[in-house]
């Protein structure tokens, strides 16, 4: 089981939240890998949204950040026509799970289901004490 290093998965440490990329048991980071392949414009837009919410605690503009699943408390960052699923976790963390390019008015159910599964895996691995590296 490969644990990712802190400097790899932490996207931004703000005053209110620490924003992280979710990583799998094999160390893959789907959202980060997606972002790394995108244009500098997309990368900068997401970074600006993440910085704003991490430093100030909220993003009021629903065209940039909104809840997409009330039951599982899943959210999406919306830089340009890309969507990055995320969730809040205790300890003032926001975990970005996966991403996709939006092609229709509806949320991609397949990608949202992946995000839900990643959230469940995150919480299970955290409870088992096998998600973060040992200090």
Task: Describe the role of every protein-language-model region.
Residues 1-81, 91-93, 101-135:
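Basic, Lys/Arg-enriched alpha-helical interface segments
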Residues 98:
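Short, conserved beta-strand/beta-arch hydrophobic-aromatic motifs that form part
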């Amino acid at each position: 089981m490969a644990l990712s290093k802190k400097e790899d998965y932490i996207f931004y440490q703000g005053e209110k939240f620490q924003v992280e990329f979710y990583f799998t048991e094999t160390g893959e980071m789907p959202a980060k890998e997606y972002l790394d392949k995108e244009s500098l414009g997309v990368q900068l837009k997401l970074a600006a949204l993440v910085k704003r919410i991490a430093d100030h605690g909220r993003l009021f503009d629903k065209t940039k950040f909104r809840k997409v699943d009330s039951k599982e408390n899943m959210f999406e960052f919306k830089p340009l026509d890309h969507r990055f699923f995320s969730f809040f976790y205790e300890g003032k963390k926001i975990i970005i799970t996966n991403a996709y390019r939006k092609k229709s008015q509806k949320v991609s159910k397949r990608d949202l289901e992946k995000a839900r599964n990643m959230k469940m895996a995150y919480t299970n691995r955290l409870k088992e004490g096998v998600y973060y590296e040992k200090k």
